[in-house]
Structure formats: C-alpha cells, structure tokens
C-alpha cells in the first residue's frame, strides 16, 4: 500500500540514503552532490517543525521509497520544489508521479499562492515527471557547473492565477 508519511517518522540519514540511491545510476552525482545531500538531511532533521510541514516521504508497504520537499518562503509569489527523489528500484513505476501529485495537492492549499516552480536538468527523467503533473517549461539556461553532464537547467512552473 502506498502512503505518505512525515520525515520525523524516520531516522536521520533516510533523506541522504534515498538521494544517494536515486542518483546512483551515475557515480559523478555522488561526487558532485554528496555534501548537499548531507546538508539537506541535517537541515530537515535539525528542524523537525519544518520537515513536518514542507515535505513528505513516500512509503510502499511501510518502506520509504522516495520523498519530496518544498520551500514556501517566497509565498504568495511562489513555492519552490526542492529535492524530489525516488529510489532507483522504484523508478518508472508511477511512484514519482504520485509523490509529486501529492505534494502539488498540498502546496495548492496555500491561500493566494501564484505559482509553483522547480528547476531540473534536461538529461534527467524528471522533466517528464514534472510535465505529467502540469508543470510548463518557461526558461532554460546553460549548465556550466560540475553537474553539466546532467544537461542544461530547465525551469518549470504551474501558474495558479
């Protein structure tokens, strides 16, 4: 059974573990993003009041297979999707779509919100997932960072006006 739980239902390190697994298809990801993954995990577990409001963990039969976070600090202009990951073994089975749809449903409840935004890379599978829940591409930029192998930056939005 698929259900959505709080980060605080799981021990510290779970977010990092899922990110490392979700991006394990290319060893360069860990080299580039490992510090960010640890920092994100630490932030959410050091701030449980934030973790409970601005993210969810997707569980299949009680096992955490993914998660998504969002940053509401720019409301009412926009809320930005942060990390959005599904363990490698559970990709391409619809779980990422369901996870993102649940997050969008929760975010849309913010009164007066104008947009939901996200940035991803062109060579990931994520663009198709974002488009499947209603995000529309509004900009793209060159990626001249250490993660350039993942393709250019794609900027998506859902307009709520």
Describe the predicted segments one by one.
Residues 1-13, 17, 159-161:
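Conserved N-terminal entry element of GNAT/NAT acetyltransferase domains
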Residues 86, 92-105, 131-132:
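Conserved acetyl-CoA-binding loop-helix of GNAT-fold acetyltransferases
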Residues 45-52:
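Short loop/turn motifs at secondary-structure junctions and domain boundaries
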Residues 131-140:
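Conserved acetyl-CoA-binding loop of GNAT-fold acetyltransferases
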Residues 3, 9, 20-45:
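Conserved GNAT-fold acetyl-CoA-binding loop/helix
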Residues 107-120:
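Conserved GNAT acetyl-CoA-binding A-motif
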Residues 57, 63-72, 78-80, 85:
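Conserved beta-strand in the GNAT
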Residues 117-127, 143-149:
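Conserved beta-strand-loop-alpha-helix junction that forms the acyl-donor binding cleft
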